[in-house]
Amino acid sequence: MSNVDGLVEDGWERVADTFRANFKDGKDLGAACCVYVDGRAVVDLWGGLADRETNRPWERDTVALVASTTKGATAMCAHLLVQRGLLDLDAPVARYWPEFGAEGKEKLPVRYLLSHQAGLPVVDTPVTFEEACAWDPLVRALEAQKPLWTPGTEHLYHAMTYGFLVGEVIRRITGRSLGTFFAEEIARPLGLSAWIGLPEEIEPRVARIEAAPFPYKSMEDLVTDFAKLMGFDPAVAGTLVKDVYGPGSTFMKAGAVGGITEENMHSRAYRAAEFPAANMFTNAHSLARMYAATVSDVDGFRLLQPDTVAAMTVVQTDRTRMHGVPPVLLPYTKNLFRMSLGFWRATPPINPLLGPASFGHPGSGGSLGAADPESRVGFGYVPNLWAATLVDPRAIELTAAVRKCLG
């Protein structure tokens, strides 16, 4: 069994037991988990291997790629500007970014960028990986792109374009890149080990990502498991998996925008560039601390005020259909994607988070950052063994343990 180090305060042993069980059961290779309550860490654990090939242990300061968990940090940057009166979510994007108004987008409001309702999950203009790393070519492609649907009438996860859309608005307002703004306004004031655009000197601290073996004998087994989790008829689940997650779907194409592949995701070029939807490197302590600062003071620093949090966590997608899903299946998609202004909201049983009022963002591979305003909790989980399932049980089990400890 892997060694687990760190802090566990009295009353929080259930979280520690759940974390240790992930190693015992082979669910984790290396990982970290942290819980803040009222601005103070009550659980701060790490263990296992940061790199199996070299037998390097996961240390307190180890960081890892957290994929789409990055989107929560990017959303916080936007809401910090809203809080300062510098960004109006109901204003057209073109007010801040005039070139965006082409192809019928002149009235598209900023809020649709944050809620994945803009109709821009993909671009028609081919953009190479090298061009995406340079930023401007993908921004130009978004300016020239016509929305796939009338903005605000449908939604679909903007897997990669989200970061360029929100990041360019922030750049136009502040004159700083998203990664620089995040570093100066969030990471440094809170003392986080978190970067969107990884400095080369941090490379020795980065955990090596491994893909977990596919746990199913066939796609039919995956569908059966998904149906059981969601309470769906297997036929319904099979159609959803095919239409939403199948090869050639817009959802799958959205994840490949900018020439992103499994190979170049682990390159120095990708780590050094800014992909504000997908390439933050951080650890669980920093995720929990960052989210804690949205619901409480952390060492005298409060990132977002209660009225800002209340406004940014209103669900935006409940009244719109998921793009590409047949109408007969729409009732089944409501709990697949409940998005507020940049954050997932709790969607039991697939993503219960910390409770009904909680918000956060998961990432491919299993990472999660979340907060709960009612219990004033910040939560972070970061693994380096990336699960190959539609729903990762590790964060679900850890957040369930947090809820139990809260009573």
Give short role names for the model-derived ranges.
Residues 296-299, 308, 313-328, 388-407:
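Short, gly/Ser/Thr-rich active-site loops of penicillin-recognizing serine hydrolases
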Residues 116, 162-169, 274, 278-300, ...:
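Active-site-proximal alpha-helical segments within enzyme catalytic domains
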